[in-house]
C-alpha cells in the first residue's frame, strides 16, 4: 500500500517522524497542537512536509498545557484522536495537567514528547527527562492508558499502534510516547504495516447479559406494581442518548443528570427534571426522592462528589442500580442492588428490546414524549431554578444569570459552548439550557482552570465556520488567555466571555461558607478588553444588559476571533 498522498516522484528521504504523520493522516487527523523544541523538531519537519501535500499540519500553541486542552477540544468535537506534542523536559511536564484532564474525562488524545538521543541517556544532556534522570514517562503513568519510551527505531511503529488502540479502548483516554530525537530521524520504511488502522480502533460493544437479564426482571416486576424508575444520566452517556431516551419513554421514567451528563439529554424533553448534585435543581432532587420510586438507574457516572451531592443518601442507597463501561467505578456503588457492566449503548438497546416485548404500550404517549419546544431559548418549564426572575435582571454590574440568558438568546443553535472551571460552571449547570445539549461542554472531573480556553480553540479547528463560545473567569484567563492569539492567527470564530469579579471567586465563596472569614483572594484590576485588543482580537466590555447590543455578532460568521468581558456582581 502506498503511503497517504505521497507523490511518487518524492525523492526526499523518509524518517520515522514521517511514519507517525502518515498514521495520523490515515485516521483523518488534521492538526497536531504543540510547542516546538529541539528534541521534537523532526516531527515538526514531517508536519511541514505533510502540510505541503495537504495532510496534517502543526498548530503552535502558546504553552504546552494549552496544546493538550486544544487536542481535548478537537477530540470531543470530531470523535477522532486529538494529538499534542512537546519537547523534552519542561515541555513534557507542562503537558501533564492537560493530559490528566483528558484522562479524568475519558477523552482520547495522543501526546508525543521528544527525548534526548539514546546514547546520551543518563549523562546529563540538556533538558534530559529520560528514565535515568527526570523520567517524565513515570510522571505520566497514572494519567495515561498507554505510556512508553521508544528505545529502538524498530519499536516505534508497533508502540504507536499499541498506543492508538489503547486510546480508544474502554475507558478511552490519553496515551503517551516519548521518542528520542535520533529515533525520529531514523529511516522509515516505504510502506506501513497497519494500513487498516481504523478497524483496529473499533470500540467493543460488550455487555453483561446476565446482569441485563436480572435488571429486566426487576423492571418488569416494578412495572406490574405501578412503581417508578428514575434515571441519573452521567457524562459517559453521549453515544447512548437516543437509547436512554427510548427506554425512559417506554418506562415513563423521569430523567435527571449529573453536571457532565447535562450534555447528553435535551433539557426540553418533558421527562427531564434537571441536574442533581452540586449547583443542581430542586426538581431533580424531588424526582430522585419520590416515595414511589423503587429503582434509580445511575448510568455512565463515576458517582463522584459533585454528581452525588457529596455522597448524598438520596442517591446512594439500596434502590441504586449502577450501569457503566468502567467496572472500577462499581466500588462506589456497593450499597446498590445491582451493577451492570458493559457498553452503555448496548445495555440500553437490550433493555428496550426486552421491555418492548413485555409491555403492551409505553408509559409515555407520543404527544407527552415530544419536546416542549425544540427551538426554545427559554427555561424549560418542568425544571425548577432558583430566582428565575434573575434571568431578566437590569442590575449593574450585570448579573451572571442575565449573562447566561443573553447567551441563550443571542447565539445560533449550532454554537458550541465550553464552560471553564469556577463560578462559570455553577451558573451554567443551573441556568444554561440548550436545545442541542451535545453542544454543551465542560470538564468536571479534574476541572482544570483554563481548560475551556484551549478547548474552545481545538473545538473551532474541529468544526470550521461554526461559532464557539468560551465562558471563563478572570483567574482562568490570566492563566491561559494567551491562547486567544492562536484563535486570532487562525481566524477562528471564537468568542471568549470573561466573568470578571476580580478574585478567585469560587474559592473565596467556599472559604467564607466554611471558615466564615473574609479572605478576598483578590485579583488586581485588569482591562481584559484592552488585553484582547493587544492580542489582535475585538474587545468589548459588558457592564449592563444594553451593552450586549454593542457586540458585532457577525464576527462569528466572518472567521474573526472576538473577546467579550463581562463584569459581574
Feature names for model-found ranges:
Residues 2-358, 413, 486, 493-496, ...:
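N-terminal alpha/beta PP-like core and its mobile active-site loop of ThDP/TPP-dependent enzymes
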Residues 17-20, 25-27, 38, 43-48, ...:
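Active-site diphosphate/adenylate-binding microenvironment
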Residues 112, 120-131, 292, 331-333, ...:
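Thiamine diphosphate
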Residues 198-206, 367-396:
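Long, charged amphipathic helices and adjacent flexible linkers at domain junctions
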Residues 233-239, 392, 473-475:
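Conserved short loop/turn motifs at secondary-structure junctions
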Residues 254-260, 422, 542-546:
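Beta-strand->loop->alpha-helix junctions that form or flank phosphate-binding loops
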Residues 299, 323, 419, 473-474, ...:
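Active-site flanking residues adjacent to catalytic metal/cofactor-binding acidic residues
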Residues 363, 367, 564-565:
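Intrinsically disordered, low-complexity polyampholyte segments enriched for Lys and acidic residues
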Amino acid at each position: 500500500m502506498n503511503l497517504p498522498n505521497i507523490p511518487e516522484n518524492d525523492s526526499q528521504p523518509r524518517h520515522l517522524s514521517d511514519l507517525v504523520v502518515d498514521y495520523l493522516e490515515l485516521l483523518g487527523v488534521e492538526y497536531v497542537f504543540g510547542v516546538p523544541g529541539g528534541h521534537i523538531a523532526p516531527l515538526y519537519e514531517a508536519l511541514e512536509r505533510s502540510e505541503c501535500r495537504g495532510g496534517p499540519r502543526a498548530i503552535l500553541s502558546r504553552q504546552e498545557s494549552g496544546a493538550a486542552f486544544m487536542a481535548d477540544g478537537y477530540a470531543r468535537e470530531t470523535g477522532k484522536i486529538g494529538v499534542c506534542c512537546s519537547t523534552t523536559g519542561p515541555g513534557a511536564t507542562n503537558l501533564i495537567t492537560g493530559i490528566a484532564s483528558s484522562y479524568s474525562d475519558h477523552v482520547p488524545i495522543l501526546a508525543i514528547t521528544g527525548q534526548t538521543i539514546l546514547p546520551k541517556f543518563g549523562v546529563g544532556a540538556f533538558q534530559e527527562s529520560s528514565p535515568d534522570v527526570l523520567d517524565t514517562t513515570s510522571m505520566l503513568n497514572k494519567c495515561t492508558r498507554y505510556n512508553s519510551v521508544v528505545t529502538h527505531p524498530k519499536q516505534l511503529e508497533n508502540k504507536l499502534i499499541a498506543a492508538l488502540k489503547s486510546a480508544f479502548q474502554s475507558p478511552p483516554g490519553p496515551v503517551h510516547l516519548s521518542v528520542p530525537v535520533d529515533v525520529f530521524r531514523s529511516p522509515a520504511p516505504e510502506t506501513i504495516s497497519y494500513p487498516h488502522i481504523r478497524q483496529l480502533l473499533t470500540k467493543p460493544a460488550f455487555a453483561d447479559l446476565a446482569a441485563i437479564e436480572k435488571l429486566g426482571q426487576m423492571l418488569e416486576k416494578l412495572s406490574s406494581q405501578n412503581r417508578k424508575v428514575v434515571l441519573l444520566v452521567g457524562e459517559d452517556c453521549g453515544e447512548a442518548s437516543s437509547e436512554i431516551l427510548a427506554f425512559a419513554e417506554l418506562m415513563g421514567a423521569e430523567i435527571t443528570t449529573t453536571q457532565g451528563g447535562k450534555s447528553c439529554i435535551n433539557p426540553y424533553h418533558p421527562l427531564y427534571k434537571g441536574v442533581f448534585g452540586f449547583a443542581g435543581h430542586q426538581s431533580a432532587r424531588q424526582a430522585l426522592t419520590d416515595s414511589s420510586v423503587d429503582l434509580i438507574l445511575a448510568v455512565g457516572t463515576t458517582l463522584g462528589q459533585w454528581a452525588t451531592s457529596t455522597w448524598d443518601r438520596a442517591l446512594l442507597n439500596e434502590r441504586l442500580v449502577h450501569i457503566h463501561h468502567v467496572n472500577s467505578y462499581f466500588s462506589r456503588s456497593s450499597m446498590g442492588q445491582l451493577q451492570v457492566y458493559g457498553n452503555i449503548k448496548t445495555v440500553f438497546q437490550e433493555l428496550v428490546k426486552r421491555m418492548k416485548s413485555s409491555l403492551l404500550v409505553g408509559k409515555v404517549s407520543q404527544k407527552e414524549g415530544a419536546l416542549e419546544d425544540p427551538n426554545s431559548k427559554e427555561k424549560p418549564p418542568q425544571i425548577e431554578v432558583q430566582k428565575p426572575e434573575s434571568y431578566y435582571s437590569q442590575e449593574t454590574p450585570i448579573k451572571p444569570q442575565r449573562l447566561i440568558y443573553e447567551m441563550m438568546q443571542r447565539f445560533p443553535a449550532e454554537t458550541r459552548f465550553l464552560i471553564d472551571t469556577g463560578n462559570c460552571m455553577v451558573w451554567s449547570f443551573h441556568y444554561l439550557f440548550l436545545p442541542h445539549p451535545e453542544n454543551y461542554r465542560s470538564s468536571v472531573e479534574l476541572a482544570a482552570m483554563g481548560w475551556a480556553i484551549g478547548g474552545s480553540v481545538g473545538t473551532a479547528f474541529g468544526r470550521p465556520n461554526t461559532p464557539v463560545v468560551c465562558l471563563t473567569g478572570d483567574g482562568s484567563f490570566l492563566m491561559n488567555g494567551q491562547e486567544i492569539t492562536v484563535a486570532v492567527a487562525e481566524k477562528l470564530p471564537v468568542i471568549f466571555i470573561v466573568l470578571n469579579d476580580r478574585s478567585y471567586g469560587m474559592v473565596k465563596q467556599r472559604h467564607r461558607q466554611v471558615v466564615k472569614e473574609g479572605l478576598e483572594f483578590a485579583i488586581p484590576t485588569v482591562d481584559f478588553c484592552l488585553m484582547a485588543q493587544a492580542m489582535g482580537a475585538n474587545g468589548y466590555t459588558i457592564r449592563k444588559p444594553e451593552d450586549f447590543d454593542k457586540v458585532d455578532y457577525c464576527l462569528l460568521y466572518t472567521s474573526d476571533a472576538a473577546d467579550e468581558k463581562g463584569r459581574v456582581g
